[in-house]
Regions:
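Core catalytic lobe of class I
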Residues: 1-272
Length: 272
C-alpha cells in the first residue's frame, strides 16, 4: 500500500503509487543473492593501484569506508608524480568511478559503501558530493541510502571566505561541512555472517542504543582531525570512521579502504 496527497495543500495522504517517479531513473540492481565470498587476508595493507584490488576476494567485504584525495593540489597528490595525478576534473572522476566500481565488486550482498568527500571551489562551486552520488547511483547502480552532513565546526571562527564583508555585493559561503555518501550493494539488509559456513546466523552488533540514535541522524557533529598531529595534510577523524563501523558492521566483519591515506580506517577497525 502506497500513499498519495489527496489535493494540493492538504496533509492527508492515501493510495499513492510512486513507481512512475522511480521509473524515470536508471533502476538500481536489486539482488536476492546471499552468497558471501571467502575471507581473504585480514589486518593487511597493500601498496598498489586501487583500480585493481584482485588480492581482495570478491564479495568478502562488509563495508568500504574511504575518503578519496580531494583533487585540490595537496602535496600528497602531486607527490605521486606524472602519470598518477589526474590531469583534470573529468579524469579525476573517471579515476574515482574505476576505484568505486572495483570497491563495489569486493562488497558482499548488502554490503555498504561510505564515501567522505569535501565539495570544491567557490568561483564557481563544484559539488563533488553530487558527482560521487551520480557515480554510485547511476553508473554503478548501487542502492543509495542517504547523505550525511559532517559538521566539522560551528560559529564565526574557522574557515575564511574572501567575499564581500557585510555587503550583498559578493558574500561567499564558508565550508564548515563535508559529506558522507552511503550506498549498499544489491539489497537493503545485511546477509547473515553464517552464510559463509552454510548456517543462517546474525553477527554481533556493537553500536550502543544512545549512539545508534545519534548516528542515524543525517548531521554528524564530529571535530576535524589535526593535520599536524597526524602528519597528513587532509586526515579524516577516527571518530567518523568508528561511527560508520558501529552503524554498518557486525563484530568480525571485513572493512576495506581503497584510499588508505594516514591509516585512519585501520586504526578505527582496531579500536572497534
Amino acid at each position: 500500500m502506497g500513499t498519495s496527497t489527496s489535493s494540493f495543500g492538504v496533509s492527508k495522504r492515501e493510495s499513492h503509487d510512486s513507481s512512475d517517479f522511480y521509473s524515470r531513473f536508471a533502476p538500481p540492481q536489486i539482488s536476492d543473492d546471499d552468497t558471501l565470498g571467502e575471507t581473504g587476508e585480514i589486518d593487511v595493507m597493500y601498496v598498489g593501484d586501487a583500480r585493481d584490488m584482485s588480492k581482495v576476494p570478491d564479495g568478502s567485504v562488509a563495508l568500504v569506508v574511504t575518503s578519496p584525495p580531494y583533487f585540490a593540489g595537496k602535496e600528497y597528490e602531486t607527490a605521486l608524480g606524472e602519470g598518477h595525478v589526474p590531469a583534470d576534473y573529468i579524469e579525476y572522476l573517471t579515476m574515482l568511478r574505476d576505484v568505486l566500481r572495483e570497491s563495489a565488486r569486493k562488497l558482499e550482498p548488502g554490503g555498504r559503501l561510505a564515501v567522505n568527500v569535501a565539495n570544491l571551489g567557490r568561483k564557481p562551486y563544484r559539488s563533488l558530493a553530487a558527482d560521487v552520488t551520480t557515480i554510485l547511483q547511476d553508473d554503478l547502480r548501487l542502492l543509495l541510502r542517504g547523505e550525511v552532513v559532517w559538521q566539522k565546526q560551528r560559529g564565526a571562527s574557522g574557515s575564511c571566505a574572501w567575499g564581500s564583508y557585510q555587503s550583498p555585493a559578493n558574500p561567499v559561503l564558508r565550508d564548515t561541512t563535508e559529506r558522507v555518501i552511503i550506498a549498499s550493494k544489491g539489497r537493503f539488509d545485511r546477509v547473515g555472517l553464517g552464510n559463509r559456513s552454510g548456517q543462517s546466523i546474525e553477527g554481533t552488533a556493537t553500536v550502543p542504543g544512545d549512539e545508534f540514535m545519534e548516528a542515524t541522524l543525517d548531521v554528524w557533529e564530529i571535530p576535524a582531525e589535526s593535520a599536524t598531529r597526524v602528519g597528513h595534510p587532509a586526515p579524516f577523524p577516527v571518530a567518523l570512521v568508528e561511527r560508520c563501523l558501529h552503524l554498518f558492521t557486525y563484530e568480525g566483519d571485513i572493512v576495506l579502504d581503497p584510499f588508505m591515506g594516514s591509516g585512519t580506517t585501520a586504526v578505527a577497525a582496531k579500536n572497534t
